[in-house]
């Protein structure tokens, strides 16, 4: 990485988070996007497109090297959706010149759940009933989490949180001003999470397509979705013999999009031992964008799903767009991703908080 100095990117097309602008000059002035090119190092970006730094709204990160891999692929902000211990996640926050990490800490899960058998899973994350929700949320708030993760499974299934417990976690989080994100990879679990009032559901069903009525309710109740199609595709390939079908996930995204539910990019990238599918950090975000377009989003929709929408829905007011005064999280790609979404993977340069990644 090189030290932050003023840089003027000239003749560059700019996707500002909402639209593609004609070639112009964008100034990187320290950690922010500036306006004055005087004295700046000039980089001619003819033929390239400048994007806001990409946001992966569902990852699992265990070390700084993983953040660097994300950054090298243009992912400048990542949202960890379940990690522990707190000291590890704290050590990965606010590292200069690499991907910025937000985190949920340990998710709320039921005794007997798959999560309960994970190594060193936090005891405080195991909720026997709604009476355990306030203490769980209080502990996460004390740890400084950015949002609360909840595991929603098919109601009544072994190892599933009850509907009352889901609702109690949402209430307790809302009282503390924390957003809630529910894991739900089955159609009935998705509906249970939506009824509980979560802000977002991550994953889409592999067991059945979401009905249009469920998608419409999700939109009417102002929920948003993080489908993680890259992971759903990989899981279906690994466990298709169990009746899991990627076409259900793809059709569910199409239904949510038609209903007007905001769609955010998230990959569930992880390298955890024993995971049903290993999804690589960085490249999977570009694959996710292509899968979203395949599911019916336009390239413009997909780019917004990776930039302005996650910034908006997670309250990240300093990023997600290209405008003076915002954080200089930027990615320069060859080509025009509005014409060909796969252009996002042709990364020429990346800036994280104004610090340029070297060696790309």
What is each model feature region?
Residues 1-7, 13-51:
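Histidine-rich, glycine-flanked metal-binding segment
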Residues 12, 31, 47, 58, ...:
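Divalent metal-coordination and catalytic microenvironments
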Residues 12, 324-360:
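C-terminal cap of metal-dependent C-N hydrolases
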Residues 68-178, 221-234:
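Divalent-metal coordination cores built from histidine and acidic residues
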Residues 157-251, 271-273, 294-296:
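Active-site core of metal-dependent hydrolases
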Residues 250-333:
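His/Asp/Glu-enriched, well-ordered alpha-helical/loop segment
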């Amino acid at each position: 990485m090189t030290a932050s100095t003023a840089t003027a990117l000239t003749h560059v097309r700019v996707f500002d988070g909402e639209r593609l602008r004609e070639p112009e000059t964008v100034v990187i002035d320290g950690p922010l996007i500036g306006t004055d090119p005087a004295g700046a190092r000039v980089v001619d970006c003819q033929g390239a497109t400048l994007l806001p730094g990409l946001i992966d709204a569902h990852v699992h990160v265990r070390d700084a090297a993983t953040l660097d891999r994300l950054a090298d692929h243009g992912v400048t902000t990542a949202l960890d959706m379940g990690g522990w211990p707190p000291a590890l996640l704290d050590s990965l926050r606010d590292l200069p010149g690499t991907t910025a990490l937000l985190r949920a800490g340990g998710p709320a899960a039921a005794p007997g759940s798959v999560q309960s058998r994970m190594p060193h899973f936090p005891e405080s994350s195991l909720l026997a009933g709604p009476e355990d929700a306030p203490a769980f949320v209080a502990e996460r708030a004390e740890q400084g989490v950015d949002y609360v993760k909840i595991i929603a499974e098919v109601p009544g299934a072994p190892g599933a949180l009850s509907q009352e417990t889901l609702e109690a976690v949402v209430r307790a989080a809302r009282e503390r001003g924390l957003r809630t994100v529910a894991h739900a990879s089955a159609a009935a679990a998705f509906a249970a999470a939506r009824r509980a009032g979560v802000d977002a559901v991550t994953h889409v069903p592999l067991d059945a397509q979401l009905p249009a009525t469920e998608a419409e309710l999700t939109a009417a109740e102002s929920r948003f979705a993080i489908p993680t199609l890259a992971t759903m595709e990989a899981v279906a390939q690994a466990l298709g013999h169990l009746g899991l079908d990627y076409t259900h996930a793809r059709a569910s995204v199409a239904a949510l999009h038609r209903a007007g539910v905001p769609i955010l990019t998230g990959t569930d990238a992880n390298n955890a031992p024993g995971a049903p599918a290993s999804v690589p950090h960085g490249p999977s975000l570009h694959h996710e964008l292509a899968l979203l377009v395949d599911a019916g989003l336009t390239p413009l929709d997909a780019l917004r799903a990776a930039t302005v929408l996650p910034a908006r829905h997670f309250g990240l007011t300093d990023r997600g767009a290209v405008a003076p005064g915002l954080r200089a999280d930027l990615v320069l790609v060859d080509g025009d991703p509005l014409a060909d979404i796969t252009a996002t993977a042709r990364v020429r340069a990346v800036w994280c908080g104004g610090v340029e990644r070297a060696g790309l």
